[in-house]
């Protein structure tokens, strides 16, 4: 497909720009099952989630010619800022019995800088920054925030569960990165697992409070089966219970791959409508509960529609 002609002049306005690397990924489960190679990464999951909910998503990433059979999963995104490279970032995603994960990187694409964002995308109001392993420079977030953009940053790729070397705030480099991002974003998001590496030795609520002390306006934290909460200065954390998820797979198991990224996508799909954080939290939880009912990696057909989410939110179905 010719991506330079796919979008007419009237279609070139995007609702949100998502920035970070995409992955050529093999997912390994504790029971020995493997799927892949599939497209993975926070960018891919959250972008497809938002697209399924009717959001026009622009993506800024590098990609190689090494996965022609699966790159088509991104066909419903505005891909004109996908930059060709000699290879796609390639990895093995390994899940442990307790649900935590680690990643073995095989190949990596280059870092993403502000100058890599095309002019049309720079005009967008909303940006979601969600790297895997520090590949999006923190000063990119600072530049966007100072331009008055609404900037959502997923900290998982800045020392959290997807990072190769996990620099915590106890390291000079880790502190500089996290404090820069907190000061130059509208919302920061992390999982409880991410925060165990980024802000070690603290509970999730304590870690969120620490992020606020570094300058974050709002800190959103996902906590698996316990739900999710957000913290803001001068307020107690506001918790949201998870929605009940029932597997649609023959083996009866939920697939947690992409759960946190799907929450982030569902959150932003709602947030860009009216800036209502409570509605966004509920939409994020509802979205994630539906995604984990299906397996198969990061595919558009796995992602719930706005109508399906509304039905679960209303009835629990």
Predicted regions and their residues:
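Conserved phosphate-binding/catalytic region of the ribokinase-like
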Residues: 2-13, 174, 204-317
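A structural signal for isolated positions on well-ordered beta-strands in alpha/beta enzyme cores
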Residues: 17, 58-60, 152, 187, ...
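Alpha-helix C-terminal capping segments
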Residues: 47-56, 270-273
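Conserved beta-alpha-beta core of the PfkB/ribokinase-like small-molecule kinase fold
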Residues: 126, 130-209, 226-227, 233
């Amino acid at each position: 497909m010719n991506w330079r002609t796919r979008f007419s002049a009237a279609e070139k306005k995007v609702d949100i720009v998502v920035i970070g690397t995409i992955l050529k990924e093999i997912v390994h489960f504790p029971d020995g099952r493997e799927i892949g190679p599939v497209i993975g990464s926070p960018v891919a999951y959250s972008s497809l989630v938002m697209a399924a909910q009717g959001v026009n998503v622009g993506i800024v990433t590098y990609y190689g010619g090494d996965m022609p059979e699966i790159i088509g999963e991104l066909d419903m995104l505005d891909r004109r800022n996908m930059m060709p490279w000699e290879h796609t970032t390639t990895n093995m995603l390994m899940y442990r019995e307790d649900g935590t994960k680690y990643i073995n990187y095989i190949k990596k694409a280059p870092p993403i800088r502000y100058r890599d964002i095309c002019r049309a995308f720079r005009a967008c109001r909303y940006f979601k920054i969600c790297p895997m392993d520090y590949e999006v420079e923190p000063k990119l977030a600072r530049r966007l925030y100072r331009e008055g953009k609404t900037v959502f940053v997923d900290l998982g790729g800045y020392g959290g569960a997807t990072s190769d070397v996990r620099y915590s705030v106890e390291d000079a480099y880790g502190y500089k990165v996290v404090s820069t991002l907190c000061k130059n974003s509208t919302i920061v998001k992390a999982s409880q697992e991410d925060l165990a590496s980024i802000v070690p030795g603290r509970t999730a609520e304590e870690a969120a409070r620490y992020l606020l002390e570094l300058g974050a306006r709002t800190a959103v934290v996902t906590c698996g089966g316990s739900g999710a909460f957000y913290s803001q200065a001068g307020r107690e954390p506001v918790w949201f219970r998870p929605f009940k998820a029932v597997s649609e797979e023959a083996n009866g198991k939920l697939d947690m791959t992409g759960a946190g990224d799907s929450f982030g996508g569902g959150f932003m799909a709602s947030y860009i409508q009216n800036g209502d954080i409570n509605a966004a939290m509920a939409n994020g939880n509802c979205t994630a509960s539906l995604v984990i009912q299906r397996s198969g990696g990061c595919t558009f057909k796995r992602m719930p529609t706005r109508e399906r989410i509304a039905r679960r939110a209303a009835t629990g179905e």
